[in-house]
C-alpha cells in the first residue's frame, strides 16, 4: 500500500472488504463463508524491493492467522518470529524420533490427608537445534501443522508405560493428560485409549 495514502483510508478499505467477504453465500441449500487473511505492508516504509515487500506481506498474513485476526500490519521483528515458527514446525517433525521430548509430572495431593493421589502429565521439549522450547510456543504450532496427533500419541504411550510401572509396584495413582481441541475433535481419539 502506498504510504501517501492514509492508514485511516486503508483501515476503512480493509473493513469494507472484510464486511463483503464475511457475508455468507449460498450454494444449493448450504451457507458458506470465505476464510481470508490480509498482510499489510507499506511502500517504501517496509521496503523498496518487490520481493521484500511480498515476503513481508506473507509474514504478516501468517501472523494474522496465528492471531486469528483478518489482517495484520507488518512490524519490525515479524521476520524473525516467522523464521522461528518455521524452525519449530520443521524440528517438531523429528522431535519424537530424536527422543527430544520428555514428560514432567505435576503432583496432585489430597489436601485432607496430604497423600499423593496422582499427577498431571506435562509435555516438555529440549530440542538439539533450538534448545528448550516452551509448550506455549510449540503446542499451538503443532496444532496448526498437524503434528499434534503424533505428540498426543507419544504422550499417551509414555503415560501408559508409567501407569503400568506404577501398577507393577502396587501404586494406584491416577494420571491426567491434557488434550488439544484438535485431539478432542479427532475421530482417532478413542483409538488412543484402547
Residue ranges and their predicted role:
Residues 23, 41, 106-108, 124, ...:
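Output-coupling edge of small sensory domains
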Residues 19, 70, 98-104, 172:
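PAS/PAS-like sensory domains
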Residues 1-86, 90:
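Cyclic-dinucleotide signaling modules
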Residues 32-36, 101, 119, 173-175:
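PAS and PAS-like sensory/regulatory domains
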Residues 84-141, 178:
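Active-site core of bacterial EAL-family cyclic-dinucleotide phosphodiesterase domains
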Residues 26-29, 66, 98, 110, ...:
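Nucleotide second-messenger and two-component phosphorelay signaling modules
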Residues 13, 81, 111-120, 145-194:
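Catalytic core of bacterial c-di-GMP phosphodiesterases, primarily the EAL and HD-GYP domains
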Amino acid at each position: 500500500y502506498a504510504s501517501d495514502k492514509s492508514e485511516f483510508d486503508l483501515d476503512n478499505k480493509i473493513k469494507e472488504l472484510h464486511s463483503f467477504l464475511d457475508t455468507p453465500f449460498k450454494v444449493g441449500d448450504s451457507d458458506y463463508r470465505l476464510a481470508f487473511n490480509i498482510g499489510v505492508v507499506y511502500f517504501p516504509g517496509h521496503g523498496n524491493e518487490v520481493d521484500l515487500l511480498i515476503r513481508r506481506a506473507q509474514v504478516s498474513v501468517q501472523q494474522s492467522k496465528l492471531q486469528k485476526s483478518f489482517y495484520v500490519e507488518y512490524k519490525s521483528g515479524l521476520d524473525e518470529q516467522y523464521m522461528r515458527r518455521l524452525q519449530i514446525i520443521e524440528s517438531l517433525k523429528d522431535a519424537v524420533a530424536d527422543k527430544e521430548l520428555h514428560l514432567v509430572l505435576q503432583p496432585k495431593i489430597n489436601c485432607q490427608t496430604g497423600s499423593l493421589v496422582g499427577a498431571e502429565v506435562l509435555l516438555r521439549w529440549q530440542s538439539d537445534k533450538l534448545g528448550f522450547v516452551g509448550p506455549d510456543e510449540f503446542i499451538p504450532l503443532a496444532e496448526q501443522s498437524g503434528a499434534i496427533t503424533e505428540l498426543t500419541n507419544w504422550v499417551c504411550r509414555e503415560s501408559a508405560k508409567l501407569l503400568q510401572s506404577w501398577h507393577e509396584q502396587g501404586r494406584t495413582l491416577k494420571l491426567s493428560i491434557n488434550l488439544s481441541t484438535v485431539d478432542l475433535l479427532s475421530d482417532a481419539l478413542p483409538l488412543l485409549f484402547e
